[in-house]
Amino acid sequence: MNFFEKILVFLGLAEEAEEEIIEDEEDVAPVNNSTFQEKKHKKRSAVQRKQKNSDQEGDSVVPLHSTKNTQGIKIHLIAPSKYEEAQEIGKYLKSGFPVVVNLEQLEMETAKQMIDFVSGTVFALDGNLHKIGQQIFLFSPPNVGIDGAIDTTGDEFFDQKTYEEYE
């Protein structure tokens, strides 16, 4: 598992890959080819019946192991230089993409307004807001789960006490 995959697993955006179990050749009994084909056909028919039944039942059945998504989840990284870029962040969130926002280039008042706007968008979408650095935030839509936490105690930016002093 490479470094990027480990980060995605940590953030809950991907699942850990399972190791394959390889059987010894000695343990496997020889199989008659025609018997194998018959069993394969019967098994396929049973699977097709289950799929038809599950299609009729709706989405109440959830697979235990998800299939690997070849596209992956795109995380947008944005360092806005003006307040007008808040709408771009909102569009990404509405489209289902998580966004990491670095507010270090903005004035304090503009950064507050940006946080207010994007936080409102996240709230309306039932998403999540995570502070991951001094002026760096992770905004995620409801379809993206975030596990873990980063300790930002002692950081005054966007601290509720500090935030109230500016009002």
Swiss-Prot record:
Segments of skewed composition (Basic residues): 39-51
GO biological process, one term: FtsZ-dependent cytokinesis
GO cellular component term of the entry, any: cytoplasm
The keyword Cytoplasm is annotated on this UniProt entry: yes
Subcellular location(s) of the protein: Cytoplasm
Segments for region (Disordered): 25-64
Keyword Nucleotide-binding found: no
Keyword terms of this UniProt record: Cell cycle, Cell division, Cytoplasm, Septation
Pfam families: SepF
Membership in a protein family: Belongs to the SepF family.
Subunit structure, interactors included: Homodimer. Interacts with FtsZ.
Role played: Cell division protein that is part of the divisome complex and is recruited early to the Z-ring. Probably stimulates Z-ring formation, perhaps through the cross-linking of FtsZ protofilaments. Its function overlaps with FtsA.
Name of this chain's protein: Cell division protein SepF
Species of the source: Natranaerobius thermophilus (strain ATCC BAA-1301 / DSM 18059 / JW/NM-WN-LF)
Classification lineage: Bacteria, Bacillati, Bacillota, Clostridia, Natranaerobiales
